[in-house]
Amino acid sequence: MAETTVEKLATEVGKSADRLVEQFSDAGIKKSKTDSVSEAEKQQLLEFLKKQHGGDSAPTKMTLQRKSVSTLSVGTGSDSKDVKVEVRKKRTFVKRDPAAEAEAEAAAKLEAEAKAAAEAAAKAQADAEAKAKAEAKAKADAEAKEKAKANAAAKAKTAPTAEEKAAQDEADRLQAAKDDVAKAKADEEAKAAAEAARILAEENSARWAEEEKQRKELEKNVDHHVTTSSEARAAEDTADANAEKRDRRPRKAPAAAPANAPANTGKGKRRGGKDNRRDSRNARGGRNARNNRSVAPESMDHAFTKPVAVVKTDVSIGETVSVAELASKMSIKATEIIKQMMKMGSMVTINQVLDQETAQLVAEEMGHKVVLIRENELEHQVLADRDGNIQAESRAPVVTIMGHVDHGKTSLLDHIRMAKVASGEAGGITQHIGAYHVETDNGMITFLDTPGHAAFTAMRARGAKATDIVILVVAADDGVMPQTIEAIQHAKAGGVPLIVAVNKMDKPEADPERVKSELSQHGVMSEDWGGNNMFVHVSAKSGEGIDELLEGILLEAEVLELKAIREGMAAGVVVESKLDKGRGPVATVLVQEGTLKQGDIVLCGLEYGKVRAMRDENGRSVTEAGPSIPVEILGLSGVPSAGDEATVVRDERKAREVALYRQGKFRDIKLARQQKSKLENMFANMTEGEVQELNIVLKADVQGSLEAICDSLNGLSTDEVKVNIIARGVGGLTETDASLAAASNAIMVGFNVRADAQARKVIESESVDLRYYSIIYQLIDEVRDAMSGLLAPEFKQEIIGLAEVRDVFKSPKIGAIAGCMVTEGTIKRSAPIRVLRDNVVIYEGELESLRRFKDDVNDVRNGMECGIGVKNYNDVRVGDQIEVFETVEIARSL
């Protein structure tokens, strides 16, 4: 390797040779221009220059800062406030200078050497001192031995004479005799004291044992802690009283006391008690503590005794009770009940309402005795207060006509009643329960006509519950349908006999045998086939078989032996209810027993009232209605729910109390069912914000239609779109409904009702979407369409063209240009593309240029050649395929 001289190094670094020689000299290296430079010298010069210009490679000082933010909850009264706490930490690291480190290491080394030398010198000195001490000790021992020998010799020389020894012995004997006398006297005194102590112990042993027992009990039960002033004062009084009792006990008078000495009286002892109390207070730091001598108090134990066992109480629990109320009854904290409920697997809050069974389990689990209270005692008393000793009489059968929609139920009833009801129904389908009674030659029959539409399940269930016989209408040309099967299930669930009316027998395509065969698959067997169900072939249009059907109904009723109390207080069931604008709440009641009269007090579910007017199914006013008679009653406090029991009571005030109690109970039960803390609801709430909601304000003419519409609309809800009925009711659309719909961005839906003038003004000013319907089909279909508009759209990619690369050209401006032949569809300049090689997508992007010959074009059709430049992609090869596609939005529907 060639040597590097100073001149050559100066040429490489771009400096003059003289300047480089000076820098070498400053770095402590003596060089001339012709001298060679080694790598070590180069490195030494470089380090010198770095230090001189402050260009060290690594920083000598580094500061790290750390900041953490936390939240502290601070309670202020009943509220809590979150305070942010920010903690900042700063730490600085300093890198020492290598020269300083070397100096420090040298100094430390010198210090260690000096320390080692000092330790060696100290050790040598200690060894010398120990050796000197050992020599001095040996010398002292030798001197002591010599001195002892000298003393023994001197003693031997000066031994006592015989006379001196005898005198000494006599003195010792006299001293021993004196000691024996003193010892005997002390023994006698000790025996006397022991005898006195034994006598005192025998006299007071029982009392001392009792006091010791009480003291141990106090120590066991009393929890020592800092007491309040009132507790300390009470403890002092107790201690003073005990001290006075002890002082009043008779004691033996001292022998040295004079005969005329004044005896201590109770009064004086009382003063002593006060003095003791004062001394105790002074010891605590009372007002006279500075002027009196401090005396330790006798006792600071307070009078409270800590309970050592669980206090078991009788807990009275009603039908519903909140967690806070239950804790108050058990005299414990609500948190204890919450902990117990968590152990039992249920998450509750302090204000949550528990049902009676749950509260009973919790209370019994915590060791308390439970007393169940029936809060509806007044309700039982009111309903039990009936007219007695009344004989039951035969009554007319209640017949419910059920079947699939458009199978001719209402038309059949029209022919029986000789009236036109079906023509008055919107769309020709029944949307209410119609209650009618018909007088025949053989007796009276009450008919309930139920809707056959799928939405009216609850109505059909109520009809089957309040009926005696079910007539199942099946169209001979249509056969068994879904609502036909549902009607069979309702009849079987209610245990009601079933009569099958095969309708539309006048049609040429009627096939009654097919109907029998299909019904037999669902457990309905004809009497001709050995079953128990009567089959009657009828035609609502021609009247064929109507008389046979009525005879079959009356025959079945005679077999059932239907009886009811005709006189006395009435009871029945609400078949239908609505809110009439002119008449108020109107309820259709089917009387089941007794006689309902105008002026009676009626308790109807959550509502009550006095019957102000009664109308029959034809709209005529009546004053009374017996068993199996349907009537409309006016005068209730509100619209009752269809299916509620209607009962006549004696006292309007008690009826009001029962109605209010039922309303509160209904509200409590509703709250008890809202378990928001359940795990399954937790996951449902996590995706709640992703679901679109269609808000609806719904009003209908009758309660039954309202229930049916609500059930149908709620059934339309999906995972993506939810129907939210924010308000519903019976009656016309009011200004309040319109304001609510405007505030919540809801659709107003009126089913056989209209909006009043004030509501229309709000609807026009707020541009609220208002829709009227009279047929439930149309309502459900339009709501479904509105929900479809809220669905997130789907996007689909459609291939619109395919080109094959035949050759590749290079362009200096664009890059690789693919000469292509369009084999399918059309190549568009604005559409995105994919590059395929061996039918595998290798690139996805967009076109940069599209030319035919030398002209820029927007599209190239099938069978034509073109030049394609792919943006940001140059790896186009012969044989590749360029696929052009576009994204198409597809509207979704439910």
Curated annotation (Swiss-Prot):
<dbReference type="InterPro" id="IPR006847">
    <property type="entry name" value="IF2_N"/>
</dbReference>
<dbReference type="GO" id="GO:0097216">
    <property type="term" value="F:guanosine tetraphosphate binding"/>
</dbReference>
<dbReference type="GO" id="GO:0003743">
    <property type="term" value="F:translation initiation factor activity"/>
</dbReference>
<feature type="compositionally biased region" description="Low complexity">
    <location>
        <begin position="150"/>
        <end position="161"/>
    </location>
</feature>
<feature type="binding site">
    <location>
        <begin position="449"/>
        <end position="453"/>
    </location>
    <ligand>
        <name>GTP</name>
    </ligand>
</feature>
<comment type="similarity">
    <text>Belongs to the TRAFAC class translation factor GTPase superfamily. Classic translation factor GTPase family. IF-2 subfamily.</text>
</comment>
<dbReference type="Pfam" id="PF22042">
    <property type="entry name" value="EF-G_D2"/>
</dbReference>
<dbReference type="InterPro" id="IPR004161">
    <property type="entry name" value="EFTu-like_2"/>
</dbReference>
<feature type="binding site">
    <location>
        <begin position="403"/>
        <end position="410"/>
    </location>
    <ligand>
        <name>GTP</name>
    </ligand>
</feature>
<dbReference type="InterPro" id="IPR009000">
    <property type="entry name" value="Transl_B-barrel_sf"/>
</dbReference>
<feature type="region of interest" description="G2">
    <location>
        <begin position="428"/>
        <end position="432"/>
    </location>
</feature>
<comment type="function">
    <text>One of the essential components for the initiation of protein synthesis. Protects formylmethionyl-tRNA from spontaneous hydrolysis and promotes its binding to the 30S ribosomal subunits. Also involved in the hydrolysis of GTP during the formation of the 70S ribosomal complex.</text>
</comment>
<dbReference type="InterPro" id="IPR009061">
    <property type="entry name" value="DNA-bd_dom_put_sf"/>
</dbReference>
<dbReference type="Pfam" id="PF03144">
    <property type="entry name" value="GTP_EFTU_D2"/>
</dbReference>
<dbReference type="GO" id="GO:0003924">
    <property type="term" value="F:GTPase activity"/>
</dbReference>
<dbReference type="InterPro" id="IPR013575">
    <property type="entry name" value="IF2_assoc_dom_bac"/>
</dbReference>
<feature type="compositionally biased region" description="Basic and acidic residues">
    <location>
        <begin position="200"/>
        <end position="226"/>
    </location>
</feature>
<protein>
    <recommendedName>
        <fullName>Translation initiation factor IF-2</fullName>
    </recommendedName>
</protein>
<feature type="binding site">
    <location>
        <begin position="503"/>
        <end position="506"/>
    </location>
    <ligand>
        <name>GTP</name>
    </ligand>
</feature>
<dbReference type="InterPro" id="IPR044145">
    <property type="entry name" value="IF2_II"/>
</dbReference>
<keyword id="KW-0396">Initiation factor</keyword>
<feature type="region of interest" description="Disordered">
    <location>
        <begin position="52"/>
        <end position="81"/>
    </location>
</feature>
<dbReference type="GO" id="GO:0005525">
    <property type="term" value="F:GTP binding"/>
</dbReference>
<feature type="region of interest" description="G3">
    <location>
        <begin position="449"/>
        <end position="452"/>
    </location>
</feature>
<feature type="compositionally biased region" description="Basic and acidic residues">
    <location>
        <begin position="126"/>
        <end position="149"/>
    </location>
</feature>
<dbReference type="InterPro" id="IPR036925">
    <property type="entry name" value="TIF_IF2_dom3_sf"/>
</dbReference>
<feature type="compositionally biased region" description="Polar residues">
    <location>
        <begin position="60"/>
        <end position="78"/>
    </location>
</feature>
<dbReference type="InterPro" id="IPR053905">
    <property type="entry name" value="EF-G-like_DII"/>
</dbReference>
<dbReference type="InterPro" id="IPR000795">
    <property type="entry name" value="T_Tr_GTP-bd_dom"/>
</dbReference>
<feature type="compositionally biased region" description="Basic and acidic residues">
    <location>
        <begin position="162"/>
        <end position="192"/>
    </location>
</feature>
<feature type="region of interest" description="G1">
    <location>
        <begin position="403"/>
        <end position="410"/>
    </location>
</feature>
<dbReference type="GO" id="GO:0005829">
    <property type="term" value="C:cytosol"/>
</dbReference>
<feature type="region of interest" description="G4">
    <location>
        <begin position="503"/>
        <end position="506"/>
    </location>
</feature>
<dbReference type="Pfam" id="PF00009">
    <property type="entry name" value="GTP_EFTU"/>
</dbReference>
<feature type="compositionally biased region" description="Basic and acidic residues">
    <location>
        <begin position="273"/>
        <end position="282"/>
    </location>
</feature>
<keyword id="KW-0547">Nucleotide-binding</keyword>
<feature type="compositionally biased region" description="Low complexity">
    <location>
        <begin position="253"/>
        <end position="266"/>
    </location>
</feature>
<dbReference type="InterPro" id="IPR027417">
    <property type="entry name" value="P-loop_NTPase"/>
</dbReference>
<feature type="region of interest" description="G5">
    <location>
        <begin position="539"/>
        <end position="541"/>
    </location>
</feature>
<feature type="domain" description="tr-type G">
    <location>
        <begin position="394"/>
        <end position="563"/>
    </location>
</feature>
<dbReference type="InterPro" id="IPR023115">
    <property type="entry name" value="TIF_IF2_dom3"/>
</dbReference>
<feature type="compositionally biased region" description="Low complexity">
    <location>
        <begin position="283"/>
        <end position="294"/>
    </location>
</feature>
